[in-house]
Amino acid sequence: MNYEEILQTVRGFCAREKLLDGKKHLALAVSGGADSMALLRVLLELRETFGYPLTACHVNHGLRGETADRDEAFVRAECARLGVPLTVFRPADVGMTVPPHAGEDWARRLRYACFAQLLAGGIDCIATAHTATDQAETLLFRLARGTGLHGAGGIRPRRPGYCRPLLGLTRVETEALCAAFGQGWVTDETNESDAYARNRLRHGAVPALRSVNDAAEENLARFCEKAARADAYFARQAEQLLSIARLDAAQTARKAPKAKAAWRLEPLQDTDPIILEAALHSLVAPVRDAEEKYIRLLAELVERGSGAVQLTDTV
């Protein structure tokens, strides 16, 4: 696709998913990489169409020494050049310190702590630069670990406080967009390391799939969209099921005095397995990552009618 076609793809995706409608103040998470720099330029182009004020934020995790400082300096310079207000975060700004063996999970928690501070301070949406390539990698990663329909839905285009305008583009297309704008970017050297499972998929599985079909990433991302729609439907059915099965306060106090809530087994045992799975997912998700193995264990428990499953140290 050429520049105009890529821009139109993003515009159409944002309009279809209602990602930018009515945003009072939009903040873009900018790492300095090609994806986030492409999103910065796209959001500047679309600002007039959707009418949102735009600011940027950058998180210096403090993990990569001089190259992290280089990335921060690059983002500062580019935002100043483009006239975009920028907020830079470091761990101490949100009351966090770098642990001895900080990894991807810690870095993600830091980023979302920074985003939460912005949302609490008046920003009503954080735009992140996830792409169709990220979507494909996420799907493969979850399938390899074991996932259900909810996990197969991948990265959602939006959730409260967040939107992902580039989910319709591949990483090749974001780099092409940067080239069309004459926009430079920086490269995080940790993305080249196969020490991380996601990077091994990025360097091995995704290119192998692309060799089978040039549109492999787009097709995997499209599958995620379909899975997410199916998951949303079954979640609505599950909500109705749990409402029917739930005991009232007096019944709960009598049958399960230590429980905050309880449900009758019969409706759960009589329902379709995929609706039961959706119901169990909604119950598990608030207390831990709803991995497939826990849903499966709980489904077996419902079928048996008695027993226990340990989900966390306290649940």
Descriptions of predicted regions:
Residues R145, L149, R171, R210-D214, ...:
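Alpha-helix boundary/capping and short turn/kink residues
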Residues N191-R198, E217-A228:
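Internal, active-site/partner-interface "lid" segment
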Residues H203-L220:
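Conserved anion/nucleotide-ligand pocket segment
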Residues Y3-D35, P53-V59, P91, L110, ...:
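AMP-forming adenylation/ATP pyrophosphatase catalytic core
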Residues M1-P207:
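Core alpha/beta nucleotide-donor-binding catalytic domains of modification enzymes
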